[in-house]
C-alpha cells in the first residue's frame, strides 16, 4: 500500500516520497503567544499530532518541529495592557499552551524554536536575499521584492495583480506605502520603534517580520528542504506563500515537498471570532467556564470530535456535535477499558497479536490522505463488540467468545486507538469520567427489583430514571433485567 497526501501546492493527492527514504522532516507553524489557545488551535495541533503518530506507526522516523512566535505586535500590545514585558507575556502563554494542549493528549514536538532565539539566522537569510537582489533596505526597514520571484502565488493559485494587500490582516498594514517599491512587497526586517524590544542588525536596530521567522527556523532546524509543511488553511496566503518566496529564492531548492493544510473551525456555522461572541478557548471548554456555558467537556471527546471530520474539511462546533462526541467517547472508552476490567478474569497472558485484517483496513484508510475519520469506524466496531461482551460477562459470568480472540480484539483497539491519540486507563483522571461502576449498577438494579416485588412502582421508576441519567439502559424480560451503557 502507498501512503498518499493531498498537496496544496499541486492541488492533487500524491504518493509520499520523502527526501531521505524512511524519514520525515515535518514543520508546523505554531502559535503567536499573546493569548490562550482556542478551538482552531486545538484542531490544528490534534491533526498534526495524529499525522505524526500515524507516520511513526507506518514505520517512518519523524522529526517534528513547531515554533513559537514570541515577538509580534499583538504580544507587545498585550504587554502594554498588562504593564508587563514582551518576555513575560510570551512565557506566560507558552506555559498556558503546554498546559492546555497536553490535556488533549497532544505529544510534545521534538523542538519548539522561538523567534527571539534565532535572530542571527534571520539576519543571515535576509542578507542572502539582499545579495541576490530580492531584498532592499529603506529607512531601517528591509522589504522583499515580490516581482523578482516569478512563481510568487503558486501555492495560493493567485496572480500578483489579483492579490489584495492586507490579506489575513497580516500583510504589513503598519508599513507606510511610500517605503515600498511595490504595494505587495512585505517586510523582512522592521526598524525599531520607541519603547519596543529591538535587536542590532546590519540595517540598524529593529525586529524581524512575521514571514521570515519560519523560513529561518526551518532552515536552522531541518535544512533547506523539508518533507511536510503543515498549518491552518488561513496561512496559505500570505504567510506560506511568502515563506516559499523567501526560502526558495535564497536556497534555490523547494522549501517543502508537500504543503498540507487543515480546515477551519466554525461555531454554529459562523466563523469563530471575539466580535461575534463565539470565541471559545481550550481551557474554557475543558473546564466549563467563560464563553463555554455547558458542562466541562472530556479532553478525549474534544479529540474525537476533531478526528470525526476529515482534516481538510471545515469543522462546525455546536453543542449537539460536542455532546455526540462525548457519547461516542463513552462507547470507545468502555472498549478501551475492557482489558483492565476483565483481562485477569479471562486469564489473558502478557502478549497478544492484533487482528491483521482490521489493521490493514485502518491502514488503507489512513494511507488515503490521512482519513482518520474512516479509521474511527474500525475502532468503534471493536469497542461496541467489547462492550457487548462486557455486558455478557457481568450478567452471565462467562462468554462463548474465546478468550484469546477477545484479547486480540482489545489489543487491536488499544493499538489503533493510540495511533489516533485516543487512550484510556482506569487510573488516568484526565481520560476517564466519574460514573457508576458495574457493582453500583447491579446494586441499584437489585434495589429496583425489590421495589417492584413490593409494588413500590414510584421507587422502581426513580431508580430506572437515575440509571438512565447516568447513561445506563435497562432491559426487562421474563428472565430478569439486563443493562448496558448508552
Swiss-Prot record:
Q: Which InterPro entries does UniProt cross-reference here? A: Cys-tRNA-ligase, Cys-tRNA-synt_Ia_DALR, Cys-tRNA/MSH_ligase, CysS_C, Rossmann-like_a/b/a_fold, tRNA-synt_1_cat_dom, tRNAsynth_Ia_anticodon-bd
Instruction: Enumerate the Pfam families for this protein.
Output: CysS_C, DALR_2, tRNA-synt_1e
User: What CDD domains does this protein's entry cite?
Assistant: CysRS_core
Q: Which processes are annotated in GO (biological process)?
A: cysteinyl-tRNA aminoacylation
Q: Which UniProt keywords apply?
A: Aminoacyl-tRNA synthetase, ATP-binding, Cytoplasm, Ligase, Metal-binding, Nucleotide-binding, Protein biosynthesis, Zinc
Q: Does the keyword Hydrolase apply?
A: no
Q: Where is this motif: 'HIGH' region?
A: 31-41
* Enzyme class, spelled out: ligase
Superkingdom: Bacteria
Q: Which family does it belong to?
A: Belongs to the class-I aminoacyl-tRNA synthetase family.
In terms of HAMAP family, this protein maps to:
Cys_tRNA_synth
Which NCBIfam families does the UniProt record give? Answer: cysS (TIGR00435)
The protein depicted here goes by the name Cysteine--tRNA ligase
What species does this protein belong to?
Answer: Trichormus variabilis (strain ATCC 29413 / PCC 7937) (Anabaena variabilis)
The root-end lineage is:
Bacteria, Bacillati, Cyanobacteriota, Cyanophyceae, Nostocales
Q: Give me the gene this protein comes from.
A: cysS
